[in-house]
Amino acid sequence: MPKEEDFQLPRRREAAKNVNYNEMEIDTKLVQQIQIAEKSGAKTKGSNSQTPRNCKRTSNPASRNEKFKYQKFLHDKNTCWNFIPTLPPSFRKNSRFSNILDLDDAMIDLKKMSLFNTESVLLSANDTIYMISEPAGEPYYVGRVVNFVSKPEFSNTIHEAIKTTSVFPAKFFQVRMNWFYRPRDIQEHVNTFNPRLVYASLHQDICPISSYRGKCSIFHKDEVFDVLPNEKECIIRPNIFYFDELFDRYTLKYYKVYSTDKILNKWNSKSPFLYVLNRRFRYIYTEPKYPLENVLKKYVFHELEVNELSPADYQWDKRCQFCKEWCIQKESLSCDECGVCAHLYCMDPPLDRKPNKDVVWTCFSCLQKQQGTKDSHVRFLEEQALELDFIRSVRQKIEEISSKAIKENVGYNTENCWFQYLGIYSISHIGDALNDSMFFPYPFKPSRVGVKYQWNGCNHNVPWRRNSYISANSEEERGSTKTSELAWVLDASKITTRKLSEYIEQCKSEICPILNVRGETCNFIDVVLKNLLFTNYDTAEAFKKCKRELSRKFLKEPSFTAVEIRKFEEAVEKFGSELRPVCEYVGTQPMSMIVRFYYNWKKTERGLTVRGKLSKLSKNKRKKEIANHENDVETKYIDDSSFDTEKLSLAESSFQCMFCKTDYSPMWYRVTGGSDDEKIKIRMQTGVNEKTEISEKSPAHSKKNEKLGALCIRCARMWRRYAIKWVPPLETLRKITGTCQNSFYSAIEGIIEENNTNKFTLSPFQAHNKLLEWELVQDSELIIRQRMKVYKNPNSFVKMKRYSMTFHTQLYKMAVRSYRKNEFHPETMQRDLELFIEDNKEVRKAIPEQKPERAKNTKDEFPVNIIRQSPGTIKTSDTSRNRKCNDVFIEKASNNNIPKITNASNDLIEISIKTGGSSSGSVSVDKGFKFVKFDNKTFQRLRNSLKLVNNKLPKYNEPSTKKIKMINDIALSNPLNEPNGASYNYTVISHSKETSVALEKYHDGNKPSKMLEKDMILKHTKNKPKNPDTAWANNSARTFCSVCKEKFNDNDNYEVVCGNCGLTVHYFCYAIKLPKDMKKNTNLKTFKWLCDPCSNDLNPIISTTYQCSMCPTKDYDYDRYRSQSFKICPDALKCTSLGTWVHLVCSLFNEDIKYGNGQSMQPALNTTAVLIKHSRFTCGVCRINGGGLVKCNKCQYRYHITCAQNSSNFKLMFEKKNMSVDTTLPCIKDVKLNDTYTLRPILICDRHDISLEGNELYPLSYKPQHTLSYIEQYCRYYKCESDHSLVELRYFEQLRLRHGEMPGNSHDSAIKPKIYVLPFERTCPHCGTNKSLYWYEDIICHSCNLRSGAQELDFDSASANISNDNGLPVEITQQLMEGIEPAMFDIDISEAGTDKNTHPSSQ
């Protein structure tokens, strides 16, 4: 053990310090330091901690947990990172791309340079748009619309027709585009670039209008904030591009672009030169280092006097002091003293090259100044004065040119070019930019002078001598009879044509099989005829000579061995029609033999098979075989940048995105390097890895089920718009956050914990600084946010994928168009253009100048049409156009209630309303008739009158206490009514969502009545005839009904014509209510009536898009309907319960569609359910999926009804089946004929003939004389849902859709079979009346019977007859009797007979 003395106290520290050994305080300070370091972004490492060794290292547990909270989420391998995220609702509209214009009814106005249709302006000059690229897999071209140019084959016709009209159909035109370049368009390999930056160019091309794919916005950098509010909007708003440079593809240089509007406002707003320049061009461009502002201040502006120019104003000026052109550094010298420049070739003597860098050059003026003599000083002042005079002369010249241009009112350049060069090489021609007759937008370039650009091979020139055309040994000139050899001439004196034909046929039949040569080969025919000529037309001798001499080698016919043929086919399969590499691949045959063999071989069956054309030819052959059964309209897939996946059965499983590797997408788009059409066709023919003769050769290490390369909709959107490829979200996030791990984790945490789906947490400015497209950043943030949901609930990914695929149908329909066959054939287009021009000339001659006349209005009506939509907005009912009413004055007569319009101010127009000579109020309207303001007196009067009118209306399932929705007293759209004009009553409609009730109320107030021909076209409806020529002059030519397509019978008075659109129908086919006795007394064609779409236009209560929701047929050719060339007419539409429209015949034939009101045949119910039910079926005529398809009665094929009507040999009829009395089916009973039967419409396609099979078939327009037509019977008794109100029916419809059920038959025939008794009209054969107290023998009226004394009234039979005439079913009678006491109907007949007060004889 050690001794006690060995233990010593510890040595005292030399420099004592106050040390705190309290661990709790040290830990607290350490935590604070860590928190401060984390906030400042500094990295804290435990290894560098300055805590004492005896102190435990501590950290903030909460902070540590937050940093690694989503560690498992980031490293989870079961959840993918490349799925297509669901876009928030606010971003879906901007995600649409690949938009295709509908040019069916589009027109082009050459004066306004605009493309428009009936609804809006589609394109105008100077619009910046996307255009499909070539090849289609590349990003969209970005360009500006310069103008519209007629196609070359129609340019002469259109140029002559411009004198009469400036509007033409769009299909005869193309669009001239001025392109903007992306960085990748200029340089091949660009790794990092700003996706929103483009470069202007002078490159222009003429392109088809159909290449349009959407609109974008391109601004100069200086003009961005004139349109957008801030810099952030420029980054986050889609389809925004900007530029500040121009790239010229000829000089291969970049130029700086200035906005003429900006330089006018910033540099000198009083300069006439800049004013005219701004009027002529939108932008000017110069070389990057060209001091344009200084040049203009010195040589153009007058703000600074010439004498006030300082030496600093000469330092930047590089004009040559001799020639006054701009000097380039490598071609000039600069004075070391004053900075004046001079060209090397302008010096005396000229210099070949610049001196070395250590050589200093001084100009002659500075040398004279250095001499200090009086003469040198005088010369210096003279040269300085000459320089100042030159500047004054330049300013004066430019000012004169500018003033002249202003006086001549020089405007924008006619070529619509945005850019004008005003750079280095235009320094001496600045004023020429204002010359209206000169146009030189391209950059100038000087002549290249010098040793580098000159040819030195002309030092030892030999005097040139012309080579004689005639050779020394030849006496005749080439081309004469002595220098040419005769191949064949027919001498009729030596041989006849018959003998010649026999000789040629003998050579073909005997020699060609031996040589294996076709008899039509040119070389064979030439040699045979040449031998005949050589033997002096002796056919026998010539045949022997041919048989003896001819061979394949002699005829230069290609002879390939089996090995050479195999190598040839392999080369063609590999290189296609590029025959030079084919020749090199074969190796043993010259190019001439390869070419001859290829053009004989490619049309053979083997050639077609190897080239992949055999299947295409067979397909075309099948198309020609069934051409007689096809309609005149064919459907095409018009988007070349995407795949027609409807024709690909493996579309969902065979494609894979080449950028993000996802395997699902609602649409697949082409990409360069991906699959093409031939590869996809081979895949569809042979399967995935099946080996056949024409299948693609898979590599030795090919994977099973290899995918076809394409782009998904997400990658295609970013690639087409911004030319960027998709990047994984974590990689995108690391680019934004940098190398800081804490920032990376914080960004992920912020993205996941953000609850607002429309808010993004990442900074747009950081993304812009890192050259990342904001749409890519949005996609990355959405993937991270939605991946967390998939991570927590893996089943949600299946729902997300299914939801994404639901957009396929909508996107596919946007890329499908229906065209008439041969519509774009040159001859057809030329004929259409000529017809259009002729019709336009006739219209101009036929339309007289109409002068408005004041209408006489004697009724106390309000001349204001109000649609009360919201408390603060009141609009007029004229929906077809915006009306202008500038400086309109209508003076009122003494006692007439015509409004007096005066201009109260520049903004409002005051309408004074007078009644009985005294003022009853006023109305203030703005010039655009968008807002109406009533004074209190007028408002109260309107309110009281509306209450009175509303109380008179029937109550349609709505309480009378509800507010009034729409008010229509009289049309404001036509205040200047012509005398004897066609006036229409505008019914006040109570608050009701039943569209059929609204249309019915209108027709009740506007029953058919007599109308003049000039009043048959309304002026302010959207559903206008497309030809301005009034088509009613040929009313007699309209021979068929638009519903049933049956011809009208002249003996029947059934035809009714719409006064606006010309719709011709049987009144019972369209469910038109006619007043009593109108049909007998008047001709229905001469009376006014409006169809439902035209009625809706007068007062829109439902959709104004009049297109059937059940079929693809579109009303596209009114002119040919009027010319009776085709069976095309305006659509006979009825409204649906959803506020859309449907063809009446489409709803009639579809058994699942019911009517809310069978008598009016509307509204159509269950249309959505029908569309869902038929979405997987295809029409046999138009080949379009879905719609209101109806199955053929004889087979399983389905068709759209309108497609069947427009096709030949299709039969649409009613099938009548006679039934027994004890039937369990709902049937119709005709009392007069004592007939019981069922009705149903049937479709028989063109593959079958009509066979009765015990049933009777009737046309759709069949109408018995005594009762309702068959179409009315079927709609009333089989299509009507009369047991419920419309609100209940819509509720049941939505309920069935929610549960995926289809509408069933409403008739419970097994329990309560219904028998519907037809009403019929009796007409007395003696007097013709149809009204009588009692009918004798069912045909003789009571009056005629009394005159004749034929019969006496039998009360027993009469009562029985009356009961039969009632025609009410038993169950309905019982319902009517509910709540009524039977005792009230007990009448004592004897007492009644003795009562004097009630007996007729006592009166």
UniProtKB/Swiss-Prot annotation:
Q: Where does each C2HC pre-PHD-type zinc finger lie?
A: 1105-1153
GO terms of biological process kind: cellular response to oxidative stress; histone catabolic process; regulation of DNA-templated transcription; regulation of transcription by RNA polymerase II; response to oxidative stress
Please give the SUPFAM superfamilies that the UniProt record associates with this protein: FYVE/PHD zinc finger (SSF57903), Homeodomain-like (SSF46689)
Q: What is its EC number?
A: 2.3.2.27
Q: Which GO terms label this protein's molecular function in UniProt?
A: chromatin binding; ubiquitin protein ligase activity; ubiquitin-protein transferase activity; zinc ion binding
Q: Which reaction does it catalyse?
A: S-ubiquitinyl-[E2 ubiquitin-conjugating enzyme]-L-cysteine + [acceptor protein]-L-lysine = [E2 ubiquitin-conjugating enzyme]-L-cysteine + N(6)-ubiquitinyl-[acceptor protein]-L-lysine
Indicate where this protein is primarily found. Answer: cytoplasm
Which InterPro entries does the record cross-reference, listed alphabetically?
A: BAH_dom (IPR001025), BAH_sf (IPR043151), EPHD (IPR034732), Homeodomain-like_sf (IPR009057), SANT/Myb (IPR001005), SANT_dom (IPR017884), Snt2 (IPR029617), Znf_FYVE_PHD (IPR011011)
Sorted alphabetically, which Gene3D superfamilies does this protein's record hold? Answer: 2.30.30.490, Homeodomain-like (1.10.10.60), Zinc/RING finger domain, C3HC4 (zinc finger) (3.30.40.10)
Q: In which residue ranges is the amino acid composition biased (Polar residues)?
A: 45-62
What are the residue ranges of zinc fingers typed RING-type? 1041-1095
The family database entries (CDD domains) matched by this protein are listed as:
BAH_fungalPHD, ePHD_Snt2p_like, PHD1_Snt2p_like, PHD2_Snt2p_like
Q: Which superkingdom?
A: Eukaryota
The BAH domain sits at: 121-258
Report PHD-type zinc finger ranges: 317-369, 1038-1097, 1177-1231
* Keyword line: Cytoplasm, Metal-binding, Nucleus, Repeat, Transcription, Transcription regulation, Transferase, Ubl conjugation pathway, Zinc, Zinc-finger
Query: Where is the region Disordered?
Result: 40-62
Function text: Transcriptional regulator that, together with ECM5, recruits histone deacetylase RPD3 to a small number of promoters of stress-response genes in response to oxidative stress. Probable ubiquitin-protein ligase involved in the degradation-related ubiquitination of histones. Contributes to the post-translational regulation of histone protein levels by polyubiquitination of excess histones for subsequent degradation.
The record, for PANTHER family, names:
E3 UBIQUITIN-PROTEIN LIGASE SNT2
Task: State the oligomer form and interacting partners.
Answer: Component of the Snt2C complex composed of SNT2, ECM5 and RPD3. Interacts with the E2 ubiquitin-conjugating enzyme UBC4 and histones H3 and H4. Binding is enhanced to methylated histone H3K36me3.
- What is this protein identified as? E3 ubiquitin-protein ligase SNT2
The species is Saccharomyces cerevisiae (strain ATCC 204508 / S288c)
What gene is it encoded by?
A: SNT2
